[in-house]
Structures are given as structure tokens and as C-alpha cells.
Amino acid sequence: MKKHVLASALIAATSISGLAAVPSELESSRFSDSDLTPSPACLCAHPNGDVFVGVDMLGSLGKGAGKGKVVRLRDTDHDGKADEHTDFANLDNPRGLIAVDDKLYVLHTVIPASTGVMTGMHLSVLTDSDGDGKADGEPRRLIKNISCLKHNQSRGADHTTNGIRMGIDGWIYIAIGDFGFVDAEGTDGTKLSMLGGGVLRVRPDGTEMEVYTHGMRNIYDVAIDPFMNIFTRGNTNDGGGWNIRFTHQIQSGEYGYPILFKNFTDEIIPALIDLGGGSGTGVMFFQEPGWPEKYNNVPMMGDWGRSHLYIHRVTPDGPSFTQKEEKFIQCSQIADVDVDGSGRLYLAAWNGAGYKGNPKKGYVERVVPKGWTYKAFPDLSKLSGPNLVKGLKSESSTARLHVQQEILKRGDAGLAPAILGVINDKSCHKEGRVAAIFTYGQLLGGKGISALMASSKDAAIQEFCLRAAADRKPIARTLPTAPFVQALKSDDKRVQVAAAVALGRIGKGAAAEALLKASVPPAPGSHDKPNSGVVLPHVAVHSLVDLEAVDACLKALDSSSQDVALWALRKMHTAKVVDGLLAKLDSTTDEELQLKIMTALARLSTKEQPYDGSWWWSTKPDTRGPYYKPVAWEQSEKIEKAYRAAYENSSAEVKNRLADIATRHRMNLKGIGKVEVVDKAAAAKKGEVGRTSIEDVMLSFEKLKGNKKRGKKILSGMACVACHNLKKGDVIKGPDLLNIKLSKEQIAESILKPAATISDSWVTVTMNDGTAHLGTLVTKNDKEVIVHDIAGIPTKVKASDVKSVKTQTSTLMAPGLANDLSLQQFSDLIAYLSKKE
């Protein structure tokens, strides 16, 4: 066996530090401990200060019924610690929460006690009409089957649907993991299926469900700013080229995971940055008065893997942004974040609860500015209509949203003139005007369109008036295209994008020519760096596809809009498109256009197999593209015949280019480019650990029985003696392997992700003179401190000379040290380590 030298601490401590580290301007307090909120997977704050926590004792990989609930917490004396709690509802796998008025929207699974097997994941709403902290009855379904049941049953809820958040447009936005979903059904009968991850949205009553964006990996939540910019912080695919991504989610956008981001980058909206390894979790956009300016008006993004809440400083860049990340609050395996109407920030900490939950791990932290004093959020139900309208001008994004929801609940159209007054009040901050725009549009529906279009003449709010007007498809279908076509000529790129998206929703083919003329794709860029120039052509193409604008696109092949037209055509699998392209291929003498047409035909030669949920691409999927499971369709034979004919009649140089195109699009044409050969032989076992995600390694423990004797031999072959004491009498070097008190999953994680958890004994001793000693703490008393470095060499210092002794926040141990092992060998190793005495 190949020898491995373990460079530092192999085994993690039995617990992770539970103290949140906040900037000096802020202060934190423990709001609840694991006795009330163990394994908190999500939370939300009601504006009145009630905190709802989703307790998920199954974690990402656990199974079984009766291990989830939503707990309501209250801090009645506002001292930073919950002093009242009730079990609001028993629900399996609570993963997303929104509290509005007396309603709690919950994303959860159902696991009957009679079988212990999951039957589905749903978006539901619960009501507490008497305010006793307990749901009045059973959840009412808004969306049924919002994940892929087979994979939730076999794996657990790890790549499933997760966080939910409401925007100022009144939609509920849902973070879809890359399990995707099959036959998700809203209350109006709308059914959708989606292969892969993205963002879904639905009205609060469960109607009008639609895909908002697609092509993400395993996002956990969405952050929504007052202008309906949506941001996500994603999840790494464990070395496959898609790491943590901070992404601006633009309506109708395709982000490319896993089949487009590497080889078809020109067809995606790239991430704003790739941040390396980690696990993005709960996020929000924070805008609350009373907080220090530098921590306000920012996306706050949790990262479970890095145990930090981050801030991303976003700077406008045309229709999108650039960004700069900075650490904000350290929180042990942060799972979620939210704020109440009084400006109290709440963080859910998983805190080492593992992959299957732990009743003794997890907590909720409260963070406020130093000097913060409690100011009660008003009881909105008792406010007059005019005072509610004034609330739309609040400096608090929390207040504006909940004021809006109270107005909509009352449904008083008599408030519309006052709301319109806020829309047209140029002295009001833009956040207030935008809140008024979306409130007005929802309150009046189609009856408010004429006023919104009149207000759209104000350049400062044009983007939002256009968006609000076309936001609901039943209304959008009735709109004229002229104002939106005119908006495509705006000097403001954000207005152009809003208009392009709206024209696709309006659905009138007459707009196709304007969309084609407005869109010029930039040069292809990277999949993980900002490229704001691609946004307008990207959304225009998706609108052209929605419009089924075949004739307009074929006509544009002789114009400056040629590239956008071909981009749209290769996304439309119809006989009319194929025949039109073949006709143009025969009639043109432009060799470059011919090659572009051949590229489009290559793309159209197959299409994606409809997703039925019977399979999943795993945590490390094939990234070749352009389809994951390409299948032939009615026009495939015709395209192959034309492609072969063109190839035979081409020069050697053109043949080479056609062969490359065929290979790139995986046409599998014998004699033209590469033909894929499926290797049916069993995959080699060596190196399985390196090729397998950490979640799948954990799942393998359920199937593979570890052998302690074999594990001992494997450990000795890994030369751990270089850094650890393996038997009694060994010199203490790195953390002790003789007396490990961790679960199999915890030991495995500490090997596969050594930076995730650090042993409490792995410390830095800082002296009064500024010097420091790194190593394993052997002795600490009022007389002396002794540490052993990684070679086992002791350093003894006087306690009076020591300034501090702190647990290390990083490790010398590199990841990948067990990569060459098979899953069986790794299971044997863990069996030995977990049974050591």
C-alpha cells in the first residue's frame, strides 16, 4: 500500500467550540441550547421577535420517522436568551421556514411512523390563529412532491430542496438542490419536473409555480434584496471544478451545472466568484436601521463547512454585480440566519451534530449591535390603512415586507391611491418606492397596469414598474409589447434585461425581432468570473425560445443578430427548426455560417432524456454536456444524414472542424470524430475514496462492515506514527489516537475534511514577549505549560510567561490522505479507530 504521512491532527475533538465570534461593534448571546433546539437545520424570525427553529434529528443522511419538529422560541424580557418555548408542530426534515402574520410556511418531508419511509417532500403552510405557539391543525399543502422521492428515500435529505424566502414581489422563492424534482404540483394543478438544481417560485397560495433559474448544484437558501436581486452561495462538488459559488440569480438564467459550465460556457450566466471548498447554507440580505453602516445593506451568506457567516460586498456592474467577500461572524457549522423586526439577528449552529443529527449538539445565537435597546415591532393588525402605507417607506426591509403582506391581507383597494403616491414620490428612497410598486401590482392585479406603465416613464423606477407589470403570467399575457420593446433601447442595462424577460412572459411573437436586435453576445468568458455583458443576450435567447420564434430567428441568420438567433434555434427541438437550418445550409455560400449551422444541427441531433426521477447523477457527475442523458428524437436521423453529407463534401480542414464539433456534442458518428465506448467492466476499487463524495462515503458505512484487524494493518501502512502516538508509551506528537471518543462519521470527516474540525488539544501558546509555540497541549497548570510539536519534541514554559493558550483554527493536515483507499479499506480503518481502547 502506498505510504501516507499524516502531517498533523488526524482525529477531531469530541466537540466543536460553540462560541460565536463577532466584530467588536456587535455582541452575541446564546439564545437557545441543544436542550431546546438540537440539530437546527433552519430558522426564521417573525417580525415580533418569535423565532421558529426547524429541528432535524435526521440531518442530511439519517432515516426514520418522528425525528423532526418546529420549535417556537420567545425572549419575553429581551435579554438575549429564550425564556419561553413551545413545540409548534411535529414535521420531518424541516428545511425552510417563513413566518408571516399568523402563518408559518414550512418546507418539510413526510415520514409515516408506520413505515419509517419517506413518502414525499412538500411546501406547506401552518396557521396559529390564537397565538398559543402551536399550529392549529395539519399542514396545508401548497406544493406537493417538491423533491425527488427515490433519492430522498435512498440517501436522505442531502441534495434535496431546502431554504425558502419571500421577496418584496410576494413570491416564495425556493432553493432546489440537484436532486431536482418530478411532478411537483401546486394548488392550481400546475405540474413541473426539473433535472438538477436552481430556484423555483410560487405564490403564497400555491398557485402559478414556475422555474426562476436553473443549473445550480446544491444551494441551500436564497438571499433577496429590496430590488429583487437574488443571491446564492453554493456547494462544492468535491473537486469536479464547481466549488462554492457566489451567484447573482437572474430570472430565466441558466447557470450550467453540471453539463454546460465547462464546455459550453458561452451559454451560461457565470458565477461572480468561485471561492474554493465549503458548504453554503442559510443566507439573507440584511437591511435594518440601528446597525453599523458597514454591516448593513449586504448579502449575508452562511457557510457550514467554514463555520462562518460571510458578507459579500456587491458593486453594480451593468445588469449584474461584482463582489468582494469578507468574514463576518464565526459560528460553528452555521445552518441558517434571519432577523426580526427589532433588528435582532439569529444564527442557527449545527455545531457538530453530524450527518444524522445529534440530540446533544446545536444551538441558536442572537447578535445585536453594542448598545442596542429593544423597540417593539408594531402590531400591524391594529394600524390604520394610512399608517400601513407609511410603513412602506420604512428603512427596514423586514418592516416593508410585513407591512405589504398586511395590506394585501386586508385587500382594501381604497389604499391604492396612497400607495401610488409613494410610487411617484421622488423624495422617498428607492427601496420604499419599489416596495410600493410591488404592493400596488399585487393589490390591484390587472386593474393597476395602466398606472404602473405611466409610472414607468420615471427612469429611476422604470425597471421595477416593467417587472411588476409582467410578474404574473395571467396578467402579462394581456399586455401590449410596445412599452417593453421601447425599453429594450434604454441606456440602462437593468431596464433592458427587465424588458427582455417581460417580453418572454408576455408571449407575443411580434417582439422577437426587437429581442434579436437588442442582443449581441460578448466573447466567451470563464464560468466562474463576472461577465455582465452576457446577461442581456442570455435572457433574450430564453425569451425567444419561450416565444417559439423560429421564423424570426431563421430570418436573422443573414443579419448582425446571427449568433443570438443560432443560440436560440439550437434550443428548439422542432422539425421546423431543423428544416429551416438545412435549407439555409444549402442556400448559403458563407463557409463560417455553414459551420455555425452545422454546430446548431449537432446540438439538435439529440436532446435530454425526460427526467423521471429513476436515476441521479451522483455527487460527482459527468460534466461533458451538452446533455446528461442524450437521446435520439424524430429528427436525429435526418440530421445525421445531412451531417455526413456535408462532411464528405468538405475540405480536409473543414472535415477536422466538423469532427471536433461532432465530438464536442457527443454525436457518436462512426468515422466522424470520437465515438464513445461504454466500459462495462467493474470500476477499479483502488482510489474509491478519492472519487467519492464525503456524503457517499458516510452512506457506505451502512453497507460495508468494517474489519478491525484489517483496519489496524491499513493504519500502520499509512505511517501515522510520523504525527500521532498509536500505542501506549509513544511520545505525544499530534492529537492522541489511542482514546478516540467519536462516532464513525466524526472520525471519517476528520480524515476526509481535516480543516472542518480541529482537536481542542491542538493549540498555539502565545508568550508575553510575542513568541508562539504550536503543538499538542500535554500539561497546563498554574506553574507550567507543556506542548509537544509535530515531531514530539516538548517545549516547557512557565505559566507566568504565557499570554494565552488557544485552540488552533487551522490544521497542518492536508485533505486527500485516504484518497487511494477503497471504500472497504476505509470502512476497515474507521472500524479500527472507532473501537480503539
Per-region residue spans from a language model:
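Post-cleavage N-terminal segment of exported redox proteins
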Residues: 14, 369-379, 442, 471, ...
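Beta-propeller domains with acidic blade repeats across secreted/periplasmic ectodomains
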Residues: 19-387, 398-402, 406-409, 480-481, ...
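C-terminal capping alpha-helices of c-type cytochrome domains
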Residues: 31, 103-104, 109-110, 172, ...
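C-type cytochrome heme c attachment motif
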Residues: 281, 363, 439, 713-726, ...
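Amphipathic alpha-helical scaffolding segments comprising HEAT/armadillo-like alpha-solenoid repeats
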Residues: 381-390, 412-424, 443-456, 474-489, ...
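Short inter-helical turns and helix N-cap capping residues of alpha-solenoid HEAT/ARM repeat scaffolds
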Residues: 395-396, 427-429, 457-461, 491-492, ...
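Residue-level detector of extended alpha-helical repeat arrays and alpha-solenoid scaffolds
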Residues: 399-400, 430-433, 462, 496, ...
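Electrostatic cytochrome c docking/interface patches
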Residues: 686-716, 731, 744-746, 770-771, ...
